[in-house]
Amino acid sequence: MSLLEVRDLEAGYGDLQVLFGVDLHVEEGEYVAIVGPNGAGKSTAMKAVVGLAAHMGGEITFDGEDIAGLPPQNIIERGVGYVPQSDNVFPTLTVEENLTIGAYLLGDLPDERREVVLEQFPILGERPDQRAGNLSGGQQQMLAMARALIPDPPLLLLDEPSAGLAPDLVEEMFDHIDRINERGVTVLIVEQNAKTALRRCDRGYVLAQGENRYADEGDALLSDPEVRQQFLGG
């Protein structure tokens, strides 16, 4: 049984339908990427999973349980971690306070979980009292991921984690995601930086105009002439 399974998903915002029958699945321990052009519906697919886009049809199951249409908080409580593309930290709060907010499901911030995430992102441990809004873009992204990992979710959803980062920081960000996955967290990522995402992931899905176009192992998609020509710039 897949940890996450999406079948024939239709979703959107208000009366605007964006997805038209999208299918995807993520097995426990996998690292899966969703790529495609702007407006393909990549982020909408992820937001539908976490309850932030309107569910208009189809199935979404997490760990065998139907979560389609549930409020976001209920989905997070079931063990889905989510990091949105923007506005993903509390800028006026400190690093430590942001991490503490991530522990709301646990009641407090256990030392063990704090140590685990700071081992993953040691630079955050060097500045616990710094306001999140004063961190660099890359550091804010690390803080957002660290906060999402505090409750120890089995599945982590990342929406465009490299967006807005300087080119030399993109590979570093993907290194962090690799290590998160290597520690046993299942990862589903939406990424505009398609070549890097497909090179790093186990499997990938290519969406266009709200529909599935291709699905295969990451390396296979990278080497597919049609995928390269249509979606990867040749």
Model-based region annotation:
Residues 148-149:
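ABC ATPase C-loop
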Residues 152:
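Conserved catalytic motifs of ABC-family nucleotide-binding domains
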Residues 14, 95-112, 120-122, 234:
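ABC-type ATPase nucleotide-binding domains, specifically the catalytic core motifs of the NBD
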Residues 50:
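Helix-to-loop junction immediately C-terminal to a conserved catalytic motif
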Residues 35-37:
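The feature captures the beta-strand-to-loop junction immediately N-terminal to the Walker
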